[in-house]
From Swiss-Prot:
Family: Belongs to the PsbB/PsbC family. PsbB subfamily.
Subunit architecture: PSII is composed of 1 copy each of membrane proteins PsbA, PsbB, PsbC, PsbD, PsbE, PsbF, PsbH, PsbI, PsbJ, PsbK, PsbL, PsbM, PsbT, PsbX, PsbY, PsbZ, Psb30/Ycf12, at least 3 peripheral proteins of the oxygen-evolving complex and a large number of cofactors. It forms dimeric complexes.
GO molecular function, a single term: chlorophyll binding
Assigned GO CC terms: chloroplast thylakoid membrane; photosystem II
Subcellular location: Plastid, Chloroplast thylakoid membrane
Gene encoding the protein: psbB
The protein's name in its UniProt record: Photosystem II CP47 reaction center protein
Source taxonomy: Eukaryota, Viridiplantae, Streptophyta, Embryophyta, Tracheophyta
One biological process term in Gene Ontology: photosynthetic electron transport in photosystem II
Keywords noted in UniProt: Chlorophyll, Chloroplast, Chromophore, Membrane, Photosynthesis, Photosystem II, Plastid, Thylakoid, Transmembrane, Transmembrane helix
Residue intervals passing through the bilayer: 21-36, 101-115, 140-156, 203-218, 237-252, 457-472
Amino acid sequence: MGLPWYRVHTVVLNDPGRLLSVHIMHTALVSGWAGSMALYELAVFDPSDPVLDPMWRQGMFVIPFMTRLGITNSWGGWSITGGTITNPGIWSYEGVAGAHIVFSGLCFLAAIWHWVYWDLEIFCDERTGKPSLDLPKIFGIHLFLSGVACFGFGAFHVTGLYGPGIWVSDPYGLTGKVQPVNPAWGVEGFDPFVPGGIASHHIAAGTLGILAGLFHLSVRPPQRLYKGLRMGNIETVLSSSIAAVFFAAFVVAGTMWYGSATTPIELFGPTRYQWDQGYFQQEIYRRVGTGLAENQSLSEAWSKIPEKLAFYDYIGNNPAKGGLFRAGSMDNGDGIAVGWLGHPIFRDKEGRELFVRRMPTFFETFPVVLVDGDGIVRADVPFRRAESKYSVEQVGVTVEFYGGELNGVSYSDPATVKKYARRAQLGEIFELDRATLKSDGVFRSSPRGWFTFGHASFALLFFFGHIWHGARTLFRDVFAGIDPDLDAQVEFGAFQKLGDPTTRRQVV
C-alpha cells in the first residue's frame, strides 16, 4: 500500500472489525504497562521509612495512584503507613499489578481474535451489505456504560458501601489513611480540597451519564444535525474523543499542580505554592506558639513538632525546584533524608532573634540575609568582606537548635553559624545521605511535577489533534474537492472539482 508512517491508521478507516481490534490491543498495552510498572516500582521501593523516605521522594509514579484508591498493603508483608501485616488479601499492590497483567493478556488474545475474524455480521449494514457502524447508537451505549461505572465508583467504592474508600488526610498531610467518604451535597462539595466532593460528583456525573446514554439510545439525531456534525463519519468520533481526552488532561494537570483532595501530599509530595506561601512554616510556628502559651520551654515546644511536618517545610521537597531534564527521583538529587537536625534560632550579640530569609522557588543561589522580627536586616554573609557591615563575625551571631537531633546544642563559631544559616535558607535542616544512591546534590522534581508536565504537554498536543481531525471531518468535501451539492452521476474515478465545468458526466 506504501502509506507514509503518519497515515497508517487509514487501514482501519472502513474496517469496523479491525478498528475494534486495534483499540483492544491499545488497551492491552496500557494495562500491561501499568501492571509491569507497578511490579518494577515494588521491586525498587523501600517502605521502611514512610516519614522521611515516602513514595514521592523515591520517585514512585503508579504506587501513589493505587494508594489513593485504597490499596495500602503488600504481599511482602509491609504496609504503606509503616509496620508489618500478616494478611494483605488479594487486593494488595502485587494483586492489582497482576490483575492488570492478566487483563492485558486477555485483551491481547481478544485483539488477535478480532483481527482474524474482522468480517462479522454485526458490522454489516443489512440494507447495503457494506461494513458500517451506527455511531450515535454506539455513543449512547458507551455513555450509558461509563455512567454506570462512574456512578458505581462514587456510590460504592468511595463511600465504602462496597469498597475500601479513598485516601483522606488533614490539611497538613500528617494523618492520612484510607477511609470511606460521605458524599458532600452542599456547596462545600465544590471545594477541590473536600474529599466528599469526589463521591458526590461521581454519583451526580454518573447519573447524568446514565440518563444521557438512555436518551441517545432511544432518540435518533435530527437529519440536519446528523449531516452538519458529520455523525456518520468515524473521524468525527476521533475528533470528539480527542477533545474529551485533552480536556481531562488539562483538568488533572491543574488539580495535580495546584493540589486537591485527589492528589494528597502524602502520596505525591507537597505543591510549590505551599513553599511559596510558607504554609507549613506558619503551622509549625502556630504549634510552637501554642506550646509556649502552655508554659512549655522552647526546647519542649519544638520537640513536639512532628518530623513529617518539618520535612514538608524543606525546599528540596518543592516540585518546582527540579529541572525539566533532571531525570531521577528526589532521593537521587539531595539524598535520602535521615533525620531532622532541629530548628535553628539565630541571635545577635544584643540577644535579638534573627530569621534567615528563605530562598524563593526559582532561585538556584540566594544571598544569606538575617532579619529581626521587624524585618530589618541585622546580619548577612557578605559578597565583599571589605565593605561588610553586617557580617556574622561583626554582628556576633550565634545559633542554637531546638528539637531534632541537635536539641539544645549551640554554636558561636562564625564558620559553623554561616553553614547553618545557608542551610536555613532551604527551610528546616535535615541530615541527608548522599552516599547510598550516589546522589549529586542537585534538586529533582517529585512525581507531582512529572505528572503535570506530561499531562499539560500531551493535552496541548491533543488539542491540536482535535482541531486537525475536527477540521478534516467537517470540511472533508472541501479538502477532497467534491461539490457537496453534486447530484449528477460522475464518471467513476473522475471527481468533480469545485468550479470545474469540464468533468465528464453521464445521464442516469
